[in-house]
Amino acid sequence: MIRLLIPIVSVVLMLVSCRAKTVDGMPIELKEQLIGLSGAHNARQLGGYRVGDKKIKSGLLLRTATLSGLSREDSILLCEKYNVQCIYDFRGKDESLSAPDVIPGKARYQSMALSFTGDGKRADTKFGSQAQMIEALLQHADHPSVQAMCTRLYEIIFFDKSSQQVYREFFTDLMTLNPENGAVLWHCAQGKDRAGCASAMLLAALGANRELIMADFALSKSYYDPIASRIKTDTDAQKNVINTLISANPELFGKALDKIDAEYGSMLNYLTECIGVTPEMMNILRERYLE
């Protein structure tokens, strides 16, 4: 069995030497975005990012990997520091059952099961855990369907009709929440693909440019590269699986954004036409989460 995740403290120590990316002259550093959870990987916030002449309020918009390993101290932190009021879980049902979230305090849990099938139908992985899924994908890395996932992953997430419906539900529910009542947290298995696309959409709705959206996505690569480098691969096809499904692939993500621009003109048009996020909704989100 592949061991997907090395201890979080080890990952954090490896990140000390990561070079900061710069957006509009401002450094975007992973260590500045991390929220200090010991039992959840890639746990960070959108707070502090500059959006035009404003910035995203700190401590209100959190993105993480699965919460199944939260410690007691993590739960206390999420309750007392962030007052998390709602958790959105983008994992499939089998994934969620295999590794149920630890729900901090009285936070509301909302399943947002998202398909990777690309066929317009909701589906759940039958692998159970993320580790089992990756092991199976490595064993069949040369299969055309696996390679298609590695080359079209973000395109599938953004353009699959059932995925769009899930994100529509996410934004619809998000609009009902008052940030004065606490933070919202969304996650998938590793907090980089399904959750990463949610973050990209939310950043765009808040007025972020493509450069910031790409920089935020790339922080997942900075986080997971030390883990991916420890997994042995024997073929180029397996390396492709690791680089995309264990780490993150900004180049592939950028191609999906290119397709959005080509087909819809902009991410904002995509949000309105495909996700149902109207300009009025965007204005409300900006009033709530920018300062």
What are these regions (language model features)?
Residues 1-4:
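Positively charged n-region of N-terminal signal peptides that target proteins for export
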Residues 6-14:
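Bacterial N-terminal signal peptides
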Residues 18-185, 197-291:
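Cys-dependent protein tyrosine phosphatase-like superfamily
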Residues 190, 194-195:
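Ser/Thr-glycine-rich phosphate-binding loops at phosphate-binding pockets of nucleotides
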